Amino acid sequence: MSSGAWVLGLGLALALGAVGARAQEVLRKQYDDGSIYEGTFKDGRQDGTGTYKLPNGFEYTGDWVAGEIVGTGKATYPNGSFYVGQFAKGKPDGIGKMTFSDGSTYDGTWIDGAMTGQGQSTYASGASYTGGFVAGKHDGQGVMTDPDGTVYDGAWLDGVKEGQGKMTYADGTLYQGSFKAGAPDGMGKLSMPDGVVYDGQWQAGQINGQGTLTKAKGDTYVGAFENGQRAGKGKLTYANGDIYEGFFAADERNGAGTFIAKDGTRYAGVWVAGHMEGAGQMTYADGSVYAGTFLADEPHGRGKMTYADGSTYEGAWVAGQMAGLGKAVYGKDQTYQGQLAAGKPEGMGRMVQADGFVYEGQWQAGLRQGQGRATYADGSVYTGQFAAGLRDGKGTLTTTTGFGYVGDWKAGVIDGQGIATYPGGEVYEGAFVGGEREGQGKLTYSADQISEGIWQKGRLLTPNPAANGD
């Protein structure tokens, strides 16, 4: 008799030659390849029940029909895996359970030696799956539970998540929507335990495309996303009522956009990395309007501010303050043109007031300080030093009345040494205190009339012995 031929794997096909034994008689037969069959035969072929062993460790015990493994039995494989269940044509077929060498199991439907149909699998990793299979892979509807508590309930194709499904993560995060190649892809909704919700397009497991993101505190963004971040055009509505509509990049406001605060403040212009930067226009809550360039959310560079009261400033800005060269118009009363720092005149500048007052010279912290020239409404002109906005130091005053003075000043008043010329032609040279002749001085009325001596509150108290005309 010839030896039998065996094919191993998930399926077995056995064809043994006739043995010439009586049907249903239990016989033991060893073949040339070392395999052994012990069981019943019929018409010279294995039939009924029997056990077949191969030298490599394979063993089958169960039903046989006309030389084939058909019916119910148990197969143990060389790698330690074993199958208990139904067979057809030498292969698992019908209902059965396979326990693999690594401890994984499959319990369910088999077709032609492959896991196909409904079944349940447990894996060495601790994961489990219940649902459809095709050719040993998850296919159709099924539920996968991972060791960390993550659960997927939905469609599968060729072993991967594909189609509509629901993914529940261990922390309570829930995704419901479309899957492709095992990851969220297409339209889907993600709900997180902290209240964050995204509803929109996905690609390869990432938020990509158009969608709506609602933050836990109520902020809502509707627009474009790229790899989980806001990118492209969108509208962000804050819980407090503020609104931004424009472009984003890397999850920040970037490019052209308009921000409107609930208090009425409005900015329309360029943004960089979430900040106002570049050309734009800001309308403030009080009605003031700035048009120009920005940096770090502040006016910076060149720009014009029109205030609610009608005042304007046009010129250079630094970090939100007027700084550099510019022109400021304060209501209808005065105009300043020149240098500024920290929002105030600083350096050289010219101030013109509606009443005719003009000052041109040095400034410090918004006050006249240093050398300058002031022309007053009555036509008087002062040229000299200033301090804290007042004439202070050396200076010359000329008036339309004929009075003139050259000398020292203190806190806006003639004080110190100087020469005063009066409308009548008199000339006083000497000391002053508080605008009056005080101390040593000489008053010349004419070439031959001089009053010289000690003065007090404008009057000569003690004439010098050599004085004439007193």
Regions inferred by a protein language model and the residue ranges of each:
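Terminal, low-structured helical/coil segments at or just beyond the last alpha-helical repeat
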Residues: 446, 451-470
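N-terminal segments that cap or nucleate solenoid repeat domains
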Residues: 23-59, 469
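Bacterial N-terminal signal peptides
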Residues: 7-17
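Signal peptide processing junction and immediate N-terminal pro/mature segment
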Residues: 18-22
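N-terminal secretory signal peptides that target proteins for export/translocation
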Residues: 1-2
